[in-house]
Amino acid sequence: MSLFKRITNLFAPSQQSNLIECNGYFYHFYKGQWVCLFNDCELVIHKFENYKYQIQVTRIVDQEQENERRKQREAEGLEDEEEEENLVNYFEFPVTNGLELYNEIGPLGNFSLSWKGTNTRFLFEFDSNNNNNNNNNNNNESIETTGNQLKRILCQCIYESMYLTPYTNGSDNEIDNNCREFQTIVRAPLTTNVKTIQAEKVTLPQQSQQEVIEEDVKPSNLYLPKDLLKEEKKKVLNSSSGSTTVSSSSSSSSNSFIKKLAPITGEELFRCPVSLYLETNSQFNLKDPQVIVLLNKTKPLEYTFYITKEDNVPIFSQLIDSNMFPQFFNEQISFIWFNALDEQPCRWSIKFSIAEEYEEFRSKFTVLHYEVVNQAKFKGKKDDIEYMANILTEDHKDDEIVFDTDDGFNAHDLEDFDNLDINESNSVADLLSEHQNSDQELDQESDDDEEDEEDEEESGEEEEESGEEEEEESSEEEQVKQPVKKPIKQEPKEESEEEESEEEEEESEEEEEESEGEESEEEEEESEEEKDNGRKVFRVPLRKPTTESEESDEDEDEEESDEDEDEESDSEENLSEDKKQISKDFSKSKNSSLIVGYKDKSYVVRGSTIGVFNTDDDGIKFNTAITNIKQKDGKNFSPKKMMLQQQDQTLLMLNPEKKSNVYKMDLNRPDIVEEWDMNWRNQPTLTNSVVSQYKNDDETNNQLFVGYNGNNMFLVDPRESKNKVTVKFHGGSNPKSVTTCAATTGSGQIAFGTSKGEIKLFSKTQFDQNKRSVTSSDPLGAIARSRTTLPGIGDPIVGIDVTKDGKWIVATCKQYIMVIPASLKDGSSGFEDRLGARRPSPKRLILKPQDIKRMGGVVNFTPAKFNIVGDEQSETSILTSTGSFLITWNFRKIKQNILDVYQIKQFQDGVVAEQFKSNRDNSIVVTFPDNVILSKKK
């Protein structure tokens, strides 16, 4: 294709939906090299819908050469039908923000663009020979001009796909800023944050130049277009007359890098020569081409990672543990780790020259890492070592897993979470101030009530005296009056004088009746507020003094008044206790846990008080406080492991001091109405936590739930009169592996996480007595055998969650999060089938290096959770936090094996707990030690 024709197509494409067409070479990244897929191809930017674009790459075949090839194969009696079926001639890629567009120099030295695909990176290199102009400078300028135009069009397409608006609405700066991070000459393989390793260049001695050329040319030629092999080899050989360069570091830089450390100690377990790299400016630069990596046993179950020179002088040492954030990369046969011990945290890398040595190091390091974390000798099989090593390998490919091809990525996913509603009334200081003000108002009201009573008594005495002097007027005043409830904020009323007319007296009586009605309404509202606040305050009506006609009832009235005074004193005592407890919880305790209901209410625990917040679309607002959470003996406790039930009508909770009991709170009262003993065959059963029988059970009236402790699990039916525990299983006699967390699917399948990092999957029929034998005479219950057990790399599982359909699991460890597909490509499920050697390998979610550095190298994730969805919906996000950072991963991208797409937001205070609102993926309730907010997308 001529240059004129190609340039013409840029401005007047043959199809209206094609924005640009270019010719060149097409590569994909494989084992650290660009492997040529198409020697000649055409790249087209195709628009198929509004704001939706595709990159289409098509192989160009020379028909004459193809016919000759077929004739030759027919003459040889070979069939090429199978070869044609397996031959891929076409690729297409959706243009989205996740494309990660890079501007690179291709393998042939021409202008190139690379982008991220589903499983690896792809590169398009412009063809410099497909040009009628013999001037090389003009060729290069033409290629660069066309390449920049292609890049500009791609940037505009990315802008439109992000904001669903024409790119003309955005300025050049907005478009450039949006694509700036992708416009770099550094390329990176998929699923890693590692940039292409670029080293400093030094001149080698002339005597070794020819050897280096022969070593470098052969492997690199295997990945170049076949028709240019001879020409490329000539260019390289001709350049041997001058100076030849390889990736290395100068001797001066190597010497300056060496630090004086303590001598190497311990038993040597592994030794291998490697090259050492240091990450600077998102690139790994070669620091020393010839160092030795050592793995030594320095103490029992303590191992040290050394980097030394040939003379055994250590230049680097670090204890092996999870704080290294270890990562293996098979394609680059390299190992990367994080060092937070220095003043400036940084990442290092070692690259092996022999694949066998790399595999040996990978297996050895995996075992040592497991033993350090568990503080126990590894006793697993060789298959378990390979499985654990694959978890630490970022680019490991599992053939049993099928990732999504539908991008499912839209502008909504790109919106960052922002704190749109920080209601100042939700801060504990303000809530406590409000509480104290309300107490002062109550005290002031009681003082006003006493003054009202005294004024009423004086007015009554005046009425009696006036009645003796004038019998006619006193007879009217002797009418029996109904008792009046105490006013809220009412000034004392003066009685009418003797000289007032009957009309004035009637008007005053009407006013009194109206005031009584208003007071009763105000008291009803106040009683409702007090009920919501969880405080039992008895409002006793106060009666006015009686006249002589009521003397016969004085004794009864005195008795009633005595009872009223007793009840009022009791209510005042209750109020006083509530005041003290609230003040204690608010001043001495911090927010400790959060649970979000599906009816737009959230519950935050602070000491023995539960704060109730309304969480609607407008924001979050404090509603009331449930105080004085007590046991049967009246002792207060701080609830743990809460769980909502029966459409947010009841709240289950555990007491850390009585671990064999479960408490049920009626949120309509609100008060603890039942305390259940978890007894199994007349033996108390400890309960570390509870989980619903089915996912989203809080939206139904199902009362059954699952409890667990250690390696035991049991089904609880609160409707049973005596034995609440109906079925129980125990997991054997291994006390070193205990259950730490659990989650259920919509069909009742159960996933458990353990302290050894294992994940155990149980069928939905686990507690079905018709399908499973539970008649064991063992007082601990029958043996629980999981359908599938996934080994861990040693880090305890601190949280676990499962999608409603049971196809995906998210497990949280301290420094990383694992996402595990529970279903294989053949439809097998880890919950229902015994997968054995086919068990899927987890994918680790690790923060980017720059974010880890922001945190000072300290990462401590809270239990990650999927967003809560209803029927016929699928989860879209994973939510967690560490320190003061709130993090949300895009789950749709994770299902495509793209693991580094997440949003991170920093707050001033540390995050205690966080949870999505029900059926919302854009609103998050965030709890801090002294505040509660709603963070949502714009």
Swiss-Prot record:
Q: List the coiled-coil residues.
A: 56-89, 461-582
Which parts of this chain are annotated as the region Disordered?
63-83, 434-587
Source organism's superkingdom? Eukaryota
Q: Which InterPro entries did the record assign?
A: Vid27 (IPR040458), VID27_C (IPR013863), Vid27_PH (IPR040768), WD40/YVTN_repeat-like_dom_sf (IPR015943), WD40_repeat_dom_sf (IPR036322)
Q: Which Gene3D superfamilies match?
A: YVTN repeat-like/Quinoprotein amine dehydrogenase
Entry GO terms, CC: cytoplasm; nucleus
Q: Where is the composition biased (Acidic residues)?
A: 440-477, 494-531, 548-575
Annotated signal peptide: none
In this chain, composition skew of type Basic and acidic residues spans 66-76, 576-587
**Which keywords has UniProt assigned to this entry?**
Coiled coil
Please report which protein family the annotation says this sequence is part of: Belongs to the VID27 family.
The identity of this protein, by name, is: VID27-like protein
Q: Which organism is it from?
A: Dictyostelium discoideum (Social amoeba)
